[in-house]
């Protein structure tokens, strides 16, 4: 496929995803998605994020009759003991989420979907993350900063939350919300130029 497109639609208001796209030189127009993000009964975390990423991309496509540029959508969730942790709805919930991961490994799943006139491609990035053992005081102090409020799993690895993480196995950008390797590959597949890269 000829690589000649230079812009995409981004189906997200996430400043982290915008920052990561800027990092790899991809220009975009934001067109937020609006879909039901409820978890299905007994749905696996991987299936959940793949479904939402695909749904977000296709929802935006439905509002773009011309579909003159590809649509990129993504969804991230944190999973511990098989339980999906979304964005906390309160400081109390954020504290409980962080306590459940304290001193333990958890998984961060980020799915991306790129929709174009040729259809929709999806990819999944899974990263294992080891959180340090956290005291109640440390958890309370972190939550009081407000950083956890709009983050799946109640922490942001790219901010103060990074001080709570001992190690990761996988994609740092995936934990931030947009795995760059998979994103670049899918965008190139549908004709988007990524500066300094090739197939």
Curated annotation (Swiss-Prot):
Protein localization: Cytoplasm
GO biological process, one term: nucleotide metabolic process
Cofactor: a divalent metal cation
Keyword NAD on entry: no
Disulfide bonds: none
Entries under CDD domains matching the protein: Maf
Function as written in the Swiss-Prot or TrEMBL entry: Nucleoside triphosphate pyrophosphatase that hydrolyzes dTTP and UTP. May have a dual role in cell division arrest and in preventing the incorporation of modified nucleotides into cellular nucleic acids.
Keywords: Cytoplasm, Hydrolase, Nucleotide metabolism
InterPro entries linked: ITPase-like_fam (IPR029001), Maf-like (IPR003697)
UniProt key word Hydrolase: yes
E.C. designation(s): 3.6.1.9
NCBIfam families in the record: maf
Reactions that this protein is recorded to catalyse: dTTP + H2O = dTMP + diphosphate + H(+); UTP + H2O = UMP + diphosphate + H(+)
Transmembrane segments annotated in the record for this chain: none
Residues annotated as catalytic: 75
Site (described: Important for substrate specificity): 16, 76, 158
Entries under Gene3D superfamilies matching the protein: 3.90.950.10
GO MF assignments: dTTP diphosphatase activity; UTP diphosphatase activity
Protein name as annotated: dTTP/UTP pyrophosphatase
């Amino acid at each position: 496929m000829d690589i000649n497109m230079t812009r995409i639609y981004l189906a997200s208001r996430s400043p982290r995803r915008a920052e990561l796209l800027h990092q790899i030189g991809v220009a975009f127009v934001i067109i937020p998605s609006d879909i039901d993000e409820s978890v299905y009964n007994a749905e696996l975390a991987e299936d959940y994020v793949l479904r939402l990423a695909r749904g977000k991309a296709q929802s935006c496509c439905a509002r773009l009759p011309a579909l003159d540029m590809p649509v990129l959508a993504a969804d991230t969730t944190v999973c511990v003991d098989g339980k999906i942790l979304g964005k906390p709805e309160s400081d109390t919930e954020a504290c409980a989420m962080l306590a459940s991961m304290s001193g333990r490994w958890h998984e961060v799943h980020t799915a991306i979907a790129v929709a174009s006139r040729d259809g929709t491609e999806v990819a999944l990035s899974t990263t294992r993350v080891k959180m340090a053992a956290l005291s109640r005081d440390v958890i309370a102090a972190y939550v009081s900063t407000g950083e956890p409020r709009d983050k799946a799993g109640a922490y942001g690895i790219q901010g103060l939350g990074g001080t709570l993480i001992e190690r990761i196995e996988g994609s740092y950008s995936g934990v931030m919300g947009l795995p760059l390797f998979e994103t670049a590959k899918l965008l190139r597949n549908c004709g988007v130029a990524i500066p300094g890269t090739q197939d």
